[in-house]
């Protein structure tokens, strides 16, 4: 189970789905993508991308190690692209408030690359505790930036890389 908290857009969830499919992990992975409002939830569930944007993304896809054609993962109709149903069905979209809602599941991975910069120090600490409480031991946490030494949960994680906000929960 992977929680994608407050993705920047539907493309972030679709990118994760494609990555997991290429690594042969998608069939046994559930992605929970949460957004802060019902309006965003509606938009994400119905979203499409212009085919031209998909074509422009092909070079970035190849540069990041993508295999084959990016368009192989999409239905194309009327100048729009939508992720294939077999990939969309493993993404559960839900409305969720990072500040006020409680943990709703235990995850092996949590990715939050966009929302934390919007929060002040107190709310950031609350959300980081929520992520710790929702992440299984040895689960992976991906954040927008590295932990600060003053972050309440910093001792619960081990960095996965020298630079960047990727961590493994160790306690």
What are these regions (language model features)?
Residues 125-137:
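A short glycine-rich, Lys/Arg-flanked "PGG" loop and its adjoining helix->strand segment in the class I
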Residues 12-16, 43-45, 152-154:
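A short acidic (Asp/Glu
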């Amino acid at each position: 189970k992977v929680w994608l908290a407050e993705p920047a857009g539907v493309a972030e969830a679709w990118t994760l789905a494609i990555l997991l499919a290429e690594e042969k992990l998608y069939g046994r992975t559930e992605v929970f993508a949460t957004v802060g409002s019902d309006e965003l939830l509606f938009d994400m569930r119905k979203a499409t991308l212009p085919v031209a944007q998909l074509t422009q993304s092909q070079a970035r896809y190849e540069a990041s190690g993508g295999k084959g054609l990016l368009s192989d993962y999409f239905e194309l109709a009327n100048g729009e692209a939508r992720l294939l149903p077999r990939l969309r069905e493993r993404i559960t979209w839900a409305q969720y408030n990072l500040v006020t809602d409680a943990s709703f599941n235990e995850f092996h991975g949590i990715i939050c690359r966009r929302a934390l910069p919007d929060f002040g120090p107190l709310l950031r600490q609350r959300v980081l505790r929520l992520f710790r409480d929702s992440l299984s031991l040895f689960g992976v946490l991906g954040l927008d930036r590295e932990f600060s030494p003053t972050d309440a949960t910093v001792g619960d994680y081990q960095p996965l890389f020298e630079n960047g906000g990727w961590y493994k929960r160790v306690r």
